[in-house]
């Protein structure tokens, strides 16, 4: 299908600051896509997954022009689950051409990200693959769904083999057991050694951030971050478009 015919369902787009992750506090353009294949207990954007949610359809070129017109270099593709949008690679291919942009894809961990990674184009696979890792302006923030989500059984674990140094893993935790599971994943897949960003976020009302810090101290988890969602301290936690 040609780019002109491919459309994406967008439920909202806005400029604000990144509330979490490696670029927390920096301006970003958020593009939220409709629909999700999971139903997490603590999801704060379930409205975007409802069958009757209102949306606008954009082509690849229209989304690219939206991004350029925003004059913001950090772009977060979120949802819902952006990777279940048909023909997402057509959009990513377009965005990869513009190295002035820093694209972050927030994905729920159930979709195989390998499908969306850049592939070598010649027989010199290793050299090109290494170059693509260093030059790719598209990164993934992989959300590992711990037990508190009710969706842990949906995790596609091979994703953790394919993570690169520019990618991030986020664990939303609600108990010491969730923290222990996060530690197991971090160690099993050598996420620190890979250079991935690693963040632990508390599920509101389930665990105290101080207990998370104590867990890091007790287990000497270097290069692992406890993060609180910055935007929820600045605005009402239920407010949209911020």
Language model segments and positions:
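Conserved Radical SAM active-site core
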Residues: 8-11, 27-28, 39-137
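Generic, low-specificity signal for short hydrophobic/alpha-helical stretches with a mild N-terminal bias
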Residues: 13-18, 45, 73, 77, ...
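Conserved AdoMet/S-adenosylmethionine-binding subsite of the radical SAM
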Residues: 84-242
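Short hydrophobic/aromatic-rich motifs at helix boundaries and adjacent loops
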Residues: 34-36, 63-64, 155, 184
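Generic structural signal for well-ordered alpha-helical scaffold segments
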Residues: 18, 64-68, 187
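Amphipathic, alpha-helical segments enriched in basic
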Residues: 6-11, 15-18, 38, 42, ...
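N-terminal [4Fe-4S]-dependent radical SAM core
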Residues: 1-32, 37-54, 232, 236-242
